[in-house]
């Protein structure tokens, strides 16, 4: 199956798994997905992830979702910059997601990072998604 937006596909898989209260979800592996998962893990939105290689050579990430008292830690995960419409922001214009209770994940010249890390590094970039 051809996927035009691999990151959007991963976010949709996570969103669907959370709606069904799944413990884990699998998604094909890529470098960008790994960096986004690193940010989600460091910010406490997922428990962990591991790379699994199948006999056919296909690599996937198994993402362990995080729940607190039966509710998912992620209440909303939304793709912002899409292949058809890229959204960029300078460091002064970085959005506050739910007044600072959520995060924006950015792709910057210094790598993929959260909005708070981007402010500390004084760098802007492409806003990949919002998580709250």
Curated annotation (Swiss-Prot):
GO terms, molecular function: rRNA binding; structural constituent of ribosome
Signal peptide: none
Coiled coil feature spans: none
Any one of the GO CC terms: ribosome
One matching Pfam family: Ribosomal_S8
Keyword field: Ribonucleoprotein, Ribosomal protein, RNA-binding, rRNA-binding
Recorded superkingdom: Bacteria
UniProt-listed InterPro entries: Ribosomal_uS8, Ribosomal_uS8_CS, Ribosomal_uS8_sf
GO biological process entries: translation
Subunit structure: Part of the 30S ribosomal subunit. Contacts proteins S5 and S12.
The protein's role, per its UniProt record: One of the primary rRNA binding proteins, it binds directly to 16S rRNA central domain where it helps coordinate assembly of the platform of the 30S subunit.
Family membership: Belongs to the universal ribosomal protein uS8 family.
Record's protein name: Small ribosomal subunit protein uS8
Annotated source species: Maricaulis maris (strain MCS10) (Caulobacter maris)
């Amino acid at each position: 199956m051809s996927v035009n937006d691999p990151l959007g596909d991963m976010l949709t898989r996570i969103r669907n798994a959370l709606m069904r209260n799944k413990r884990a979800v699998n998604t094909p592996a890529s470098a960008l997905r790994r960096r986004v998962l690193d940010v989600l893990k460091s910010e406490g939105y997922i428990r962990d992830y591991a790379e699994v290689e199948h006999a056919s050579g296909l690599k996937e990430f198994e993402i362990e979702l995080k729940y607190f008292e039966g509710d998912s830690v992620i209440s909303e995960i939304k793709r912002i910059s899409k292949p058809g419409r890229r959204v960029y922001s300078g460091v002064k214009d970085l959005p506050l997601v739910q007044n600072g209770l959520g995060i924006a994940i950015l792709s910057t010249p210094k790598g993929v990072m959260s909005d708070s890390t981007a402010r500390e590094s004084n760098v802007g970039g492409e806003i990949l998604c919002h998580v709250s």
